[in-house]
Amino acid sequence: MWIDLLARERSDKMSEGEGQAKNRLFLGIDLGTSHTAVMTSRGKKFLLKSVVGYPKDVIGLKLLGRPYVVGDEAFEMRSYLDLRYPLQDGVLSEISDRDIEVARHLLTHVVKSAEPGANDEICAVIGVPARASGANKALLLKMAQEVVHTALVVSEPFMVGYGLDKLNNTIIVDIGAGTTDICALKGTVPGPEDQVTLTKAGNYLDERLQNAILERHPELQMNTNVACAVKEQFSFVGARGEAATFEFRAAGKPVRCDVTESVKIACEALMPDIIESIEILLRSFQPEYQATVLQNIVFAGGGSRIRGLAAYVKDKLRPFGNADVTCVKDPTFDGCRGALRLAEELPPQYWCQLGDVSGQ
């Protein structure tokens, strides 16, 4: 396989210039709307919220003691911070210089948290939505150039497939917070025609769930943070054996409500577009491979934790044949794990064959 040959070439070069190679730090970065997951070639891995917090006023500045804070710490201090999420629907906002500055603060923090050495050559593979625009990828690479030596942006579902060794006759469905990315893997680097990006994903589910709950219980005090907590605890499609009840607040007092039907409605609202996209990509394979593809449908991302998902999709695909639908074992890190593996197996000088690259 060509990857193996290139990996061997890199190994030869490492033995020739071992001193330089051992100072190369590889990063696999799954840069998400809600969370960013990172793995490094030195065994470090971490997850943080994709958010930057800035003091709302001088009191907030006094409490914080610095101009801004990134990640989970920012979210915990949200009462006196202005929270900025630099990624919308999985891609960087291009609205203003302020938005770009927020994204730069996030990316700088991510790389710093990987703990590179002073003399390290930092090489990062960064995941983006399957159909991210060229302009958006160029913007991300421009910022990456400020904090790493070489960067490659690749499709997020392709990263998952690479990490799982599923690069042929496979459909990967990555349900994130901002986007659901669906990719047909055919043994080559996927092109635009092999990929679909849907904006109905985790954040959309939160909004639908909040509205569905308030429709039944208008007295509740609700926001998307509460809806997200309900989703993470009870999300399901299909049938559920027992009632889902959650403790809310109404007029400041605790009240427990049955949210089973609301959760079902919100979660299943994602499914029609996903099923339709799988069907379209399935038909793009040569007919002799389609039965094999049906045996290799993989769900990844936070949305793959929805209970009953595999069985639900398998049933919806029944007209096409007997499908084997699975969910990844580690939705949090499978994307960046694939990115790191790609970075380590393929020398950076060949990254331009896979996607957009900076620093070469």
From Swiss-Prot:
It holds the Pfam family MreB_Mbl. Disruption phenotype: Non-polar single gene deletion has wild-type growth and motility. Has half the number of magnetosomes which are mostly incorrectly positioned and of lower chain length; magnetite crystals and magnetosome morphology are normal. No magnetosome-associated filaments are seen. Incorrect subcellular location of MamJ. Incorrect positioning of magnetosomes in dividing cells, leads to uneven distribution of magnetosome crystals. Deletion of 3 consecutive genes (mamJ, mamK, mamL) leads to cells devoid of magnetosomes or a magnetic response. Filament dynamics depend partially on MamJ. Changing residue 174 to A: Magnetosome chain partitioning, movement and placement in cell is seriously impaired, many cells have fragmented chains. Impaired magnetic response. Has lost MamK dynamics, probably has no ATPase activity. Cells do not separate totally. GO terms for molecular function: ATP binding; ATP hydrolysis activity; GTP binding; metal ion binding. Its EC number is 3.6.1.-. Induction: Part of the probable 17 gene mamAB operon. It is found in: Cytoplasm; Cytoplasm, Cytoskeleton. It is an enzyme of class 3 (hydrolase). SUPFAM superfamilies: Actin-like ATPase domain. ATP binds at residues 22, 33-34, 89, 177-179, 231-235, 302. It comes from the Bacteria. It catalyses: ATP + H2O = ADP + phosphate + H(+). GO terms for cellular component: cytoplasm; cytoskeleton. Its main location: cytoplasm. Disulfide bonds: none annotated. Signal peptide: none annotated. The keyword Metal-binding applies. One of its GO terms (biological process) is magnetosome assembly. Forms cytoplasmic filaments. Interacts with MamJ. Forms filaments in the absence of other magnetosome proteins and in E.coli. Filament formation in vitro requires ATP, GTP or a non-hydrolyzable ATP analog. This bacteria makes up to 60 cubo-octahedral magnetosomes of about 45 nm in diameter which contain membrane-bound crystals of magnetite (Fe(3)O(4)). Belongs to the FtsA/MreB family. MamK subfamily. Protein with ATPase activity which forms dynamic cytoplasmic filaments that are involved in sorting, concatenating and/or correctly positioning of magnetosomes in the cell. Not absolutely necessary for assembly of short chains. Filaments grow from the both cell poles towards midcell, and are probably disassembled at the other end of the cell, a process known as treadmilling. Polymerizes in the presence of ATP, GTP or a non-hydrolyzable ATP analog. Required for correct segregation and positioning of magnetosomes following cell division. This is Actin-like protein MamK. It comes from Magnetospirillum gryphiswaldense (strain DSM 6361 / JCM 21280 / NBRC 15271 / MSR-1). The gene is mamK.
